[in-house]
């Protein structure tokens, strides 16, 4: 089986509430996470809610990084979706876990666009390969990590 991309789903618990409620901090952290993962940034859009919370997305040539924060619960939900094999989504995830001071994190990796047979890849350079399909729960940073493994047929 082949997959078009990797999608990390992060749940960050017991974070720094002030950091999660600061538009500048959240935006700068997400942009830096994209850079550290070697992503090509295309656009950055963030919104600050009243009385608290931030939502935003860093659109990258390889897909996106998105975040929704709940400072009142010291919680953030983050997606790091990457197509191709250059981007390093774990690097972005580790950086965000550290930046927001999460003492507990759930990280689940999904393979997106799984094909049972080799498919043409008009969006990739000639000779490029798709990622091998798998699903895993990764231990990142020093935070406690939990998650469930889901079998993928092969």
Mark where each language-model region is.
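Polybasic/polar functional segments that serve as interface/processing modules
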Residues: 1-154
